[in-house]
Amino acid sequence: MRDLQQLLDELKDMSFFNPGEMCIIGCSTSEVIGKRIGSVGSMDVAKEIYENLKQLEIDTGVTFAFQGCEHINRAVTIERANFNPLTMEEVTVVPDVHAGGSLSTYAYQQMEDPIVVEHITVSKGIDIGQTLIGMHIKHVCVPVRTSVKQIGEAIVTIATSRPKKIGGERAKYQ
């Protein structure tokens, strides 16, 4: 999947991935192969994407969280070691290709000790196929522009965040 590797290399060169940070991944493998979101799914595509992301975790120290589909309320699969009971609520569900999506299903199967949480707040994310990851990105969400606009047939959107600017016209920010 040349598009994916090109995107990840470009983001890596931009220092998008930082050690200890968590990045949310939303992915419609159906969209990647040119079908309507949620229609067919592909564990083969999920495996290829996951393995590329896993290598990036090793290379950069970033951690990935995997958003499920709307059938599980876009719940997020993470390693239990990253679970914070003060800011996250565990839910009882095991992602499945038809209720959770192929990538979150594959991630759940590959993780050492997976847990699914209802909601997470992270500073950045990659959305492959318009899966609507924005609900898991800190305010204020900011788009990141790259030369890669699609992974396969899926539109890709990258987001980061910045702190809110508060205080009105008299406030100073620098």
Swiss-Prot record:
Cross-referenced Gene3D superfamilies: Hypothetical protein TT1679
InterPro entries for the chain: Antibiotic_NAT-like, DUF436
Pfam families recorded: DUF436
HAMAP family on file: UPF0340 (MF_00800)
Membership in a protein family: Belongs to the UPF0340 family.
Protein name in the entry: UPF0340 protein SE_1711
Species this chain originates from: Staphylococcus epidermidis (strain ATCC 12228 / FDA PCI 1200)
